[in-house]
């Protein structure tokens, strides 16, 4: 993973952003980044009662005090749209080179022009969409790379297509065998 700037991840709810961020943390750890240099905060945690930039700074200060990161820490802020003013805090942290930051959220504020202006030149955008049908098949352990792969598997592919159309294309649905009522 390369981190030239902060990273903004925006995609719909249940599309796997928390999972992807945790994979990023794991990958950094595998690449030799010390665990004390990795901080993951989920702002939907009910233990956070007042969500503002003061809380973000308190979290960062407590993290530094107790884990003593060396070098530049990586901070992952999940569902950051819950915190009023978070974008100014991220900009300040980036400008002061205090951390490399990944933010994720699932509302329109993360996509706003105002936010793009506020973080211009300071971030990269990563947008993840729900699964394509081919990805959905792969999640269900079926690989279809050519028309020959379909031969003799039409019934199973049709069953999965029905599931894809009826249930949606989010990873959680693809991995579930449960049928849900709407």
What are these model-predicted stretches?
Residues 39-71:
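Short glycine-rich substrate-engagement loop in P-loop NTPases that contacts/grips substrate
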Residues 20:
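Hydrophobic positions on the alpha1 helix immediately C-terminal to the Walker A/P-loop
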Residues 100-106, 127, 136:
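Structural recognition of the conserved hydrophobic beta-strand(s) that form the central parallel beta-sheet
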Residues 17:
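Conserved lysine of the Walker
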Residues 134, 138-182:
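Interdomain hinge/linker elements that couple catalytic modules in large macromolecular machines
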Residues 92, 109-125, 137-142:
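Short regulatory helix/loop adjacent to the ATP-binding pocket of P-loop NTPases
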Residues 13-14:
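Walker A (P-loop) phosphate-binding loop of P-loop NTPases
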Residues 6-10:
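Short hydrophobic/aromatic beta-strand immediately N-terminal to the Walker A/P-loop
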